[in-house]
Amino acid sequence: MNGSWKLILPVGFVLYSLPLFLRVNGTSDYVIDEEFHIPQGLAFCRKEFDVWDPKITTFPGLYLIALLLNPLSLCTVTGLRMLSLAGAGINILLLYKIRRRILAGSGGNSYAAHEAITMSVLPPLYFFSHLYYTDTLSLTMVLLFYNYWQQEAHLPAAVFGAASVLMRQTNIVWVCMATGMTVLDTLVNQCARTGRVPKENVRLMGKELWLQLVSSPQLLCNCILSILAKCCFYASIILPFVGFLFINGSIVVGDKSAHEASLHVPQLFYFAIFAAGFGISNTIRQFRPAAELIRRNRVLSLLALLLILVVVHLNTEVHPYLLADNRHYTFYIWSRLYGRFWWFRYAMAPAYLLSICVLFCGLRHMPESFKLMFPLSLFLVLCFQRLLELRYFLVPYILFRLNTRHTRKGYAEWLELGAHLLLNVATFYVYFTKEFYWKNYRTPQRIIW
């Protein structure tokens, strides 16, 4: 049945989405940021590489993929949007393969397929699968990279890692995360092979590993050589990117004014709410352990709650775009709750703490290298973004969700899938029925994620 799922999932996903795609495609020439992406994509599709919109802030990966349409004479708005739908079809296949490998047989192929479907219809991700935005194809490249990295096929992994960075600069963080995990896993595996201590005692958090490395120059040399052999391809991405940062002075290309880096720690709190809210099956499984963790550590929990309140008070950033653009749900969340009631951002602190504990409990069973590298990567990719933008949460959420444990509670997975589908119905209904006009746009504006 494994081979059947590899065909059924992508084909079924595209066929299921096609009527909705055609309806979305007929509503507007451009949807918000598509006014930058589509003209640029059409120019590259026609091989007009001297055309570049200075307002674009990402590398040209999204537009280079448009070259695939040129031989097919599909350099149209519909053709560009179809690239995203095709990418979403590839994503569901990759999600299935990666999830099945992580589960290692637990739950079977049908369970992995169910999980892949659930992640593919994650409402913000599913919505942008119908538009020519960076998000879907950026995730495609990250998943291709992660898939090959899992299999220790480091050369193709590096190729797709570079492609992911061409899609979105912040994807360099996930390349660095996987590189760091490779280094840490190599240290553990090399030390375990010596047989000097039981394999189960060789842990990143334990002293046995580090004592072995310090006491054996030969072992240390073997580790270094093995790490260099595995990571040289990733270094060929990371080092040039460091050079780019040094020369450019910023991770952003083009118009840097709207994307200046500034410390914004509450992004972690927003992500925790996002992950706990959409990852219903993990939240159901980890809610009791998280509540017990808080109960057993009341003093630490109180201190953590106070720290959250201090961070919210001192470091809440409000980007002008968040207040100015009423075409996004975040505008309404902020204007009607966070911005309207001064106390609301503080009242959310207990929910932030509980959501963080749910994520922490979800991490506990994962490999030690992931437990170390993922939180660091999450901090780097989110906490220097001033703008609250749910699309920034998609890749870290999917990587976290892929690594969660099999719930063994069938209703939890079905509840999560059902909630995603119902929310998709609601958000597309709003998109199709709620129209309003801006003075400088001739076409009606609509509300999206």
Curated annotation (Swiss-Prot):
InterPro entries registered for this protein in UniProt: Alg10
Transmembrane residue ranges: 2-22, 59-79, 82-98, 233-253, 261-281, 299-319, 341-361, 370-390, 412-432
Record localization: Endoplasmic reticulum membrane
A Pfam family recorded for this sequence: DIE2_ALG10
Residues glycosylated per entry: N25
Domain of life of the source: Eukaryota
Family: Belongs to the ALG10 glucosyltransferase family.
Protein known as: Dol-P-Glc:Glc(2)Man(9)GlcNAc(2)-PP-Dol alpha-1,2-glucosyltransferase
Annotated source species: Drosophila melanogaster (Fruit fly)
GN (gene name): Alg10
